[in-house]
């Protein structure tokens, strides 16, 4: 999957993965992590999600990473936030009170901006990668996060042959096998969400589940 894929999606506004409200599962399960106010939280492939605002409203310092410049600029303009921009190595850093977004390639993001991170949130990052790139992403994420960092992972699972991703299907078995070397894993919830996703219904996908995991970096 090339960067041009995501740039084209944003340019044509084919952003069905973007929600116009805070993710309900984030609201339901984030408090269980019990992160103190002032903690730093990393959100990979953040897009322009309103989840960043929710996390900031919990008193957290939010650090995102997003490939597409338009998505980053839309986050600040849509939410009417003042923003400062400065170069940071290979990335551009957009910063306002409590939210910083590094615009550029996640795989090229240095560790230094995340040295004080103690939390993380992945709703649309793991499931955005095709199977051949998924392990590379997991290793990248694990390499960026300090030990004992705690976070939420939200995934989708369905018969992959029934629909072309993204979002791609990620099974519990895959998570346990490929992420357990780096994270302690606890599944908090798995729900049938087929009826809530008309795209999947239209394509006659037989089943669709959404799961929430609590992860702790080893």
Curated annotation (Swiss-Prot):
- Which molecular function GO terms apply here? thiopurine S-methyltransferase activity
The positions annotated for binding S-adenosyl-L-methionine are 10, 45, 66, 123
Which Gene3D superfamilies does the annotation name? Vaccinia Virus protein VP39 (3.40.50.150)
PROSITE patterns, alphabetically?
Answer: SAM_MT_TPMT
Top EC group: transferase
- Keywords (A to Z) from UniProt: Cytoplasm, Methyltransferase, S-adenosyl-L-methionine, Transferase
Principal localisation: cytoplasm
Q: Which organism is it from?
A: Shewanella loihica (strain ATCC BAA-1088 / PV-4)
Cellular compartments annotated: Cytoplasm
EC number of the protein: 2.1.1.67
Q: Which reaction does it catalyse?
A: S-adenosyl-L-methionine + a thiopurine = S-adenosyl-L-homocysteine + a thiopurine S-methylether
Q: Which family does it belong to?
A: Belongs to the class I-like SAM-binding methyltransferase superfamily. TPMT family.
Q: Which GO terms describe its cellular component?
A: cytoplasm
Q: Known NCBIfam families for this protein?
A: PRK13255.1, TMPT_Se_Te
Q: Which domain of life is it from?
A: Bacteria
The record's listing under HAMAP family reads: Thiopur_methtran (MF_00812)
Q: Which gene encodes it?
A: tpm
Q: Which residues cross the membrane?
A: none
Q: By what name is this protein known?
A: Thiopurine S-methyltransferase
GO BP annotations, alphabetical order? methylation; response to metal ion
Q: Per UniProt, what is one Pfam family of this protein?
A: TPMT
Q: Does the keyword Cytoplasm apply?
A: yes
What InterPro entries has UniProt attached to this entry? SAM-dependent_MTases_sf (IPR029063), Thiopur_S-MeTfrase_Se/Te_detox (IPR022474), Thiopurine_S-MeTrfase (IPR025835), TPMT (IPR008854)
């Amino acid at each position: 999957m090339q960067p041009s894929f995501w740039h084209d999606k944003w340019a044509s506004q084919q952003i069905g993965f973007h929600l116009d409200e805070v993710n309900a599962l984030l609201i339901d399960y984030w408090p269980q992590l019990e992160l103190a106010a002032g903690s730093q939280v990393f959100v990979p492939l953040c897009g322009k999600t309103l989840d960043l605002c929710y996390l900031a409203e919990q008193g957290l310092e939010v650090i995102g990473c997003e490939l597409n410049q338009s998505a980053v600029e839309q986050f600040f303009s849509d939410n009417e936030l003042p923003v400062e921009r400065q170069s940071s190595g290979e990335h551009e850093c957009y910063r306002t009170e409590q939210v910083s977004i590094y615009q550029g390639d996640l795989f090229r993001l240095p560790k230094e901006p995340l040295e004080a991170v103690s939390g993380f949130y992945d709703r649309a990052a793991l499931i955005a990668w095709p199977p051949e790139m998924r392990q590379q992403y997991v290793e990248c994420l694990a390499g960026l996060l300090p030990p004992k960092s705690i976070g939420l992972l939200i995934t989708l699972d369905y018969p992959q042959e029934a629909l072309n991703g993204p979002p791609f299907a990620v099974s519990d078995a895959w998570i346990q096998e490929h992420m357990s070397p780096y994270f302690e894993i606890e599944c908090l919830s798995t729900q049938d969400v087929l009826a809530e996703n008309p795209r999947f219904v239209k394509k006659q996908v037989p089943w669709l589940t959404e799961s929430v995991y609590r992860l702790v970096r080893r």
